[in-house]
Swiss-Prot record:
InterPro entries: Ribosomal_uL16 (IPR047873), Ribosomal_uL16_bact-type (IPR000114), Ribosomal_uL16_CS (IPR020798), Ribosomal_uL16_dom (IPR016180), Ribosomal_uL16_sf (IPR036920). The keyword Lipoprotein does not apply. This is Large ribosomal subunit protein uL16. The gene is rplP. Binds 23S rRNA and is also seen to make contacts with the A and possibly P site tRNAs. It comes from Cereibacter sphaeroides (strain ATCC 17025 / ATH 2.4.3) (Rhodobacter sphaeroides). PANTHER family: 50S/60S RIBOSOMAL PROTEIN L16, LARGE RIBOSOMAL SUBUNIT PROTEIN UL16M. GO terms for cellular component: cytosolic large ribosomal subunit.
Length: 137
């Protein structure tokens, strides 16, 4: 699964996801893409599940690009532990996704296969998405 090799700090504040994507909102690599329409944290497991669903439907044809990276550590405390005594340990890694962000791009397959593959990948994600085609702009 995806996670940073090293970070400057082990833990981060939760923060909030404000506004729309300032970058990464155009198709740069493939002809079809999956665009987020709402703000949410997407975990490394969810990204990997979506990638597997997309590549499985494409039957190893074409190419898939993952345009988001889980670089935010999410901490949690063990069950039945009282509040206080410091912040919990890192549980998983997540990517903060803003509306308008392209998350996946694919190329090298027909439009029907591409749309179905992206639809299957979108089912694995916790946010609503749109399928965009390069001819849209």
């Amino acid at each position: 699964m995806l996670q940073p090799k090293r970070t400057k700090f082990r833990k981060q504040h939760k923060g909030r996801i404000h506004g729309e994507a300032k970058g990464g909102f155009l198709l740069n690599f493939g002809g079809f893409g999956l665009k987020a329409t709402e703000p949410e944290r997407v975990t490394a497991r969810q990204i990997e599940a979506a990638r597997r669903a997309i590549t499985r439907h494409m039957k190893r044809q074409g190419r898939v690009w993952i345009r988001i990276f889980p670089d935010t550590p999410v901490t949690s405390k063990p069950t039945e532990v009282r509040m206080g005594k410091g912040k919990g340990s890192v549980d998983f890694w997540a990517a903060k996704v803003k509306p308008g962000r392209i998350m996946f791009e694919i190329d090298g397959v027909s439009e029907t296969i591409a749309r179905e593959a992206l639809r299957l990948g979108a089912m694995k994600l916790p946010i609503t998405t749109r399928i965009v085609v390069r001819e849209d702009w």
